[in-house]
Structure formats: structure tokens, C-alpha cells
Amino acid sequence: MTGKFGITVLGSGSKGNAAVIHGPEGKLLLDAGFSARELENRMEQREIDPDNIQGILITHGHADHIKGCRTFADRHHVPAYLTAPTLKDADRNHFLPERKTVIAPGSAFELCGITVEPFTLPHDAVDTIGYTFRAEQKKIGVATDLGHLNMLARQKLRGCALLMLEANHEPSLLQMSPRPIQLKRRILSRHGHLSNEDSLAALEELLTEDSVSLVLAHLSEECNNRDLLEDMAEKTLKKLSCTFRHARPL
């Protein structure tokens, strides 16, 4: 999507999360959950020049979203944007670069010709946020780590031209997995991760006549099945009267 408002997903899952937001006046990196070298490689594979990134937007301080932030930001001389609690939390793990800008949920700001609005999500990391991006009379919404879709998230994510939403696990596969019971309970909690059913049940409310594309993200390699999710998504989307016709698990 180089040259127009859009998003290129570099990777999404427990091993790392990152995406490039293309704006009218530049590009932003959303999360930096891979090493700096891996981020650069993934960008170059998609014909994105890493030197064109003008800032890094962080959703929360878990390593799979932030571990490459310091090296990439310092190497390319760009700031990281994150909330004050996340800054404090991530600084302890030495994930942050020299240049940092504090942002606040509910307070929109302008970058690269994009109106960026962070909003709070219910997740078990300190001060987790999602984002909406507005430009060219379109809205992109991203929410990839949340235990449930609360009223605020539903309000912010409704009517996106492109929606990137978590579909982390299939509950039956999670329960059969060898994961510790404490981890299973955390994932299933209201501050854990969305299941396939959780995500798909929300689409009737979130997708409107303005919705063009959906990306189902943060799939568990161990506790989800891409073919199953694809089938579930296609069946759900046939019921909806919107322009959306594509589901792409990552």
C-alpha cells in the first residue's frame, strides 16, 4: 500500500507483532516486536525503505510488541510514542530508545498526515492501547491484544475501512493444549485474548457500509487453526450486508 493511506502487516502472533501505517506524508511503524534486523528485512521484502519510517507507535510493553524498538529507533533516528505507564514498564527492560514521546488514551495527535487516536483496551499488560488512524476520509482500526470488546473499543472500531482485530484462539484447542492451567485462565479472562467466536460475533456491529477489508490477527500457532478460522469468518461474513469480502488470518 505504498503511496496511499493503508497498512502493511509485517507479522502478527506470539513471536512478534509489527505493521507499517502508510500516511499521506510518511510512514509509521506500529509496534516493533521483532529484532531491528528482522523488522528491516520484512520491510525490504515488501519494498518499504526502513529509513522512511518517521516514528514507532507502541500498543503495550509485552516483548512481542516492543523488543526491537530501541535498536530500530536509535538506528533510524526516530521517536517512540507510548503512554506514560508503558514507558515506565518498558524502560525497566531496556526496550526504549533515547527519543520518546508520551501520548495519552483519548488524546488524538497528527503524524504523517494521519490523525492518530489511541484508546484503552482491556488486556493484562500495563495500559494497553489500540489505535484508530484517519486520513483521506477513511479510518483504519487496530486492536490486537484484548480480553473482550468493551463499549469503548466497539465505539472506536466501528465503521473502519480496514479493521485489524485479534482472533487469538479456539477455546477447545486451548483447553486441550499442554499449557499450564494458570496461563489458560489468563488467556480466557476478560483481560486476556479474544477467541475466534469473540471476534466474529462482534463483526455484525463493527462492520458497516464503509468497511472494505478485515485482517484477523494475533493467531496462536498452538491454540488456533487457520483453516477453521477462515471457514468461520467466511460463514459469518456472508450474513453481513457490507462491502467486505476478504478475511486474511496471519
Q: What function would you assign to each model-found segment?
A:
Residues 1-46, 129-144, 162:
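Conserved beta-strand hairpin/beta-sheet module of binuclear metal-dependent hydrolase folds
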Residues 30-33, 53-61, 81-84, 141-144, ...:
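Active-site neighborhood of phospho(di)ester-bond hydrolases with catalytic His/Asp-centered motifs
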Residues 83-130, 134-137:
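Metallo-beta-lactamase
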